[in-house]
Amino acid sequence: MVSALRGAPLIRVHSSPVSSPSVSGPRRLVSCLSSQSSALSQSGGGSTSAAGIEARSRALRRRWCPAGIMLLALVCLLSCLLPSSEAKLYGRCELARVLHDFGLDGYRGYSLADWVCLAYFTSGFNAAALDYEADGSTNNGIFQINSRRWCSNLTPNVPNVCRMYCSDLLNPNLKDTVICAMKITQEPQGLGYWEAWRHHCQGKDLTEWVDGCDF
């Protein structure tokens, strides 16, 4: 058996360049993969004998997919297996209602308009906004809360004051985001923690941010 296996030819992937992707790409992928399955079933199936291994080896060598097609198949598979972040882009009044229901209107002396203004100038109302700083930290969620102090990216020796993962701040229901934002505003600087609020919202007439919104 061992000598028979040693004599079996190796399976090689063609190294010829793959043409640019086109509309026919997915059909080629399905055809390529199905042809391999057909080749296997026609050439010994699941046989573990030396003859069966030899037959499958020859069939795969004849019908082996180009490297680019196999890479495309792998990417498609990973995209199905990996969890996707559900992005949520809020409308102005929609966000105002959610933050109002969470009790942010008047919290620590800040109006609901302060919070809506902050959300616009930090994330554009995008609950799944994620931004990377030069030091490797991340700004997360609709208020762009930073990972250096407030949440955990599994980086050692980070305070994680909000006691949550940074990925929790990307949740579209905003519950964890609001909890963490409340902790931040309990600090002496309050909403001044956010540079965007200091530059665009502090001391300004913010009535337009909640104008026409029903609660």
Curated annotation (Swiss-Prot):
GO terms for cellular component: acrosomal matrix; acrosomal membrane; acrosomal vesicle; extracellular region; secretory granule; sperm flagellum. Pfam families: Lys. PANTHER family: LYSOZYME C (PTHR11407), SPERM ACROSOME MEMBRANE-ASSOCIATED PROTEIN 3 (PTHR11407:SF25). This is Sperm acrosome membrane-associated protein 3. The processed form is expressed in sperm (at protein level). Expressed in testis, epididymis and placenta. Keywords: Cytoplasmic vesicle, Disulfide bond, Membrane, Secreted, Signal-anchor, Transmembrane, Transmembrane helix. The keyword Membrane applies. The record marks 87-88 as: Cleavage. Disulfide bonds join 93-213, 117-201, 151-166, 162-180. SMART domains: LYZ1 (SM00263). Belongs to the glycosyl hydrolase 22 family. The processed form derives from the membrane form by proteolytic processing. It comes from Homo sapiens (Human). The keyword Transferase does not apply. GO terms for biological process: fusion of sperm to egg plasma membrane involved in single fertilization; monocyte activation; positive regulation of macrophage activation; positive regulation of phagocytosis; sperm-egg recognition. Residues 1-63 are cytoplasmic. Sperm surface membrane protein that may be involved in sperm-egg plasma membrane adhesion and fusion during fertilization. It could be a potential receptor for the egg oligosaccharide residue N-acetylglucosamine, which is present in the extracellular matrix over the egg plasma membrane. The processed form has no detectable bacteriolytic activity in vitro. Interacts with ASTL.
